[in-house]
Amino acid sequence: MRILYIHGLDSRPNPERISSLESNGHQVFALHLDYRTEPSSYLKLKQYAKGEQVEFIVGSSLGGLMGFWLGEELGLPCLLFNPAVYFGRENANIQLENRIGCPRRWVVIGEKDEVVDPQISYQYFEDIAPQSQAQRVIRCQWLGHQIDPDTFREVQRWVGL
């Protein structure tokens, strides 16, 4: 499967996560973005996803917010870790051309997240798709903002990646 991995704010693509996905036979694409100086990051990701014919999105924090909207706009399934939904579409300069809708979404929320308020994230996803079969929200009591390798691999396995 062709996967786009999107890192968070002030971060970079995580080689361990990319390697974990690749070890299962996936082709992983990842851009290093400086969201603070590149206001067109979303557009760049969208063009890249289309050009590489991406089939699945994995995103973390601000990358999770970008991944959420890419999934909605391009009709791609996604796995989102602590998506920074509080940041908002407008603040991230996300312009939608159309909205096909995400066919399948997994959202992992760390209950000990010290950066992204887990309750705001949980409520956001409950409000947009209450009891939807197309969305699974996983609340991890032990998880902070950083995703440890064991949790990443376990969720990856659970999702089927």
Language model features with spans:
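Active-site catalytic motif of lipid deacylating hydrolases and related acyltransferases
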Residues: M1-E52
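Conserved alpha/beta-hydrolase fold motif
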Residues: F56-V58, C78
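Catalytic histidine-centered segment of alpha/beta-hydrolase-like enzymes
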Residues: P39, R139-T151
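Short beta-strand/loop motif that positions the catalytic acidic residue
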Residues: G101-C102, W106-I109, D113
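Acidic catalytic loop of the alpha/beta-hydrolase fold
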Residues: S11-R12, E111-D117, H145-Q146
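Gly/Ala-rich beta-loop-alpha elbow adjacent to hydrolase catalytic centers
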Residues: V58-G67
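Short alpha-helix in the alpha/beta-hydrolase fold that links the catalytic acid
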Residues: R17-I18, N93, D117-D127, F152
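Active-site nucleophile loop of the alpha/beta-hydrolase fold
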Residues: G8, L31-D34, L76-G88, G110-K112
